[in-house]
């Protein structure tokens, strides 16, 4: 194939280079090396550029065209001004606005605007266009050059009138776009300081000849070989229609862009799992490429990205762009990035696609499965019921809802629990839940941990609420729970649920129900997993599914208390100034059993208290109960004297238990029952008289009593002071036992345990055990000889008295062992000091003369013994706790 053939099919006006072979290139290179060839080549160039030779060339071309009946006119463009723009936003182009006298002059005529009705001038501007040519810009890049030639008068008017100049520019742009089928960027027009771009080249204007010569009319012998000559009047010039509507010039150009779907390779998508190819068609990211050839940087460019669109705006003079692109997928606008390529003038935006969660995919699959079932027209009924029965049930529900339309609260959509709960899942009822009511708000606390917030679903109705949620276990396996709360029928029928709020946390789920009116009197509610598994729960305290029997017993107790309280009782209160006591007498009215109902109620309450208290005993209390200690004889004497004063029967008033000490508690503590008054402290002051073991026992250690007795019980059945410390009494009351007086003292010292970071717990345990042993030995050494002698004397005195044998046997055994270990105590029987070393007996030397002081000294010695035993017990308990740690 020759070079001429290849050049014929090549794109001369495009961006393609000249197609030339290596052989042809070598021949041209060798020829240019020859000096004679170069001389001939330069002579040819000079001959072409010579004006005289060009004139001769034009005359010859005119003569040849005239022989064919065509008039030829050469147009020589004269420089005017240059317009710079781009073609399709890609290629830079220049339009030369030139002048030539050959082109007709512009003319005008008066016309009326059809839209506004105003008169004006309608201009007709002739023009001539020269075919485009390729050229290079200042950066040696390829560009296009178009020449549009007007009459010189048109350019003169454009210089004098700005409106005519704009009209001239629009006419030139319209001619180029119409003739060469290109799109020019009119929003970014520039006017460089040039008169003409490139080298001016003449163009030819051809018209049909009207007056042929006689020689031309003679037939030519070879005329039949050529096509017939066109006649002058045969054809008419093509008249382009005038624009009736002026198109608005856009202020901004729309750049070219493309959207690419980016998808990385995930080996999990090539498995045989059912959900392996769910996200195959969804890309990982979207790449938006925008071509901006007129921008050298993005400093003056504004870019906004949302989840579904990309907005670009550039207001730079000469580079005005505006673009809005709608994205096919939802993207994460916070994690995207943009980069501008200065070499290719391209802006590349990468946006990651937001994929659906597994839960949304499961919901989509359920929806598709339900739609497929509806389309098939056949539904499987697992219970074997006919569709007619289901339709009847639906009709009955709808009729029931129509009856409730008269109420102020419209019924919600009828959704059966079977459709609310998924049949392929097993739902559990929360093991523990609380119910609290305040005004018109009911709060349920479901004790379930690690609840997934997105799994919570509610179904609200007028008098019921259905809740389902899932909890993630330790093995990352979900456990599904369901909770249906329903108000009982017949209880406050006007009560409705207005609003539901569900709050999930790490430890529990809080369900808040706002009712339409006050609901503090609501006695109970129904709860379960569904409507077939509902149980009634009373509205008070903490409800546990495992202690339903205890709840029933407490409800029965409350009912019995209500029956007794409904009976009319007669209460008489007498104040005795001599004994400083208040006597309360409770008698039923006539025709009623005076004591049967009260005694039966009292016995029933004691049984419940014992049963309830035995369940709450911890290891420490059980261990203390196992160690039985004998009562000191001094304390037994005082208790016996106090018991003789109250042998007469007295009725009691039973009031409900409260957290603070009430009137009924102190009154019941003074009755002649089997329970003994107890103290509220385990440890006592080192510098005061210590109570005996029987008085120092806390109320919580006694299974048959639930009251604290930190009050004055000085020989009376009732005390008027509940919180104050009793004062010392004299006179007739000096003989009463001081051990029955309870004194409360508090220590400012705070016990704390500190563990070092670099030591082990076992090491600390051994050190603490050694410290406690040393402290115990020091406390045992503090017992004086007088204390031991007094113990022996007390043993000999009370052993021969009227005390029972089982009360003194333990004391005698202890004193006997103590005397064997300390033989020197017999010499100092009169000395009685406290374990701290202070004399608290106030004159122990005169014990034989003062009988009351002697009794006080004996009681102090017994209290010191009991205190030592309590401290030993506490040391054992602390050692046990340290071993557990």
Swiss-Prot record:
| Lineage top rank: taxon | Eukaryota
Spans through the membrane: none
Q: Where is this region: Disordered?
A: 208-235, 371-390, 607-636, 644-663, 781-806, 819-871
Q: Which stretches does UniProt call biased (Basic and acidic residues)? A: 213-232, 824-837
The biological process GO terms on file are: axonemal dynein complex assembly; cilium-dependent cell motility
Q: Which GO terms describe its cellular component?
A: cytoplasm
Composition bias, Basic residues: 612-629
User: Where is this gene product found?
Assistant: Cytoplasm
Residues with PTM Phosphoserine: 376, 784
Please list the GO terms describing molecular function. Answer: protein phosphatase 1 binding
InterPro entries registered for this protein in UniProt = Kintoun (IPR034727), PIH1/Kintoun_subfamily (IPR050734), PIH1_N (IPR012981), PIH1D1/2/3_CS-like (IPR041442)
One Pfam match, given by its short name, reads PIH1
Bias-annotated ranges (Low complexity): 842-855
Q: Does the keyword Zinc-finger apply?
A: no
- Keywords of this entry: Cytoplasm, Phosphoprotein
Functionally, this protein is described as follows: Required for cytoplasmic pre-assembly of axonemal dyneins, thereby playing a central role in motility in cilia and flagella. Involved in pre-assembly of dynein arm complexes in the cytoplasm before intraflagellar transport loads them for the ciliary compartment.
Q: Which family does it belong to?
A: Belongs to the PIH1 family. Kintoun subfamily.
Question: What does the record note on quaternary structure?
Answer: Interacts with Pp1alpha-96A, Pp1-87B, Pp1-13C and flw.
Name of the protein in its database record: Protein kintoun
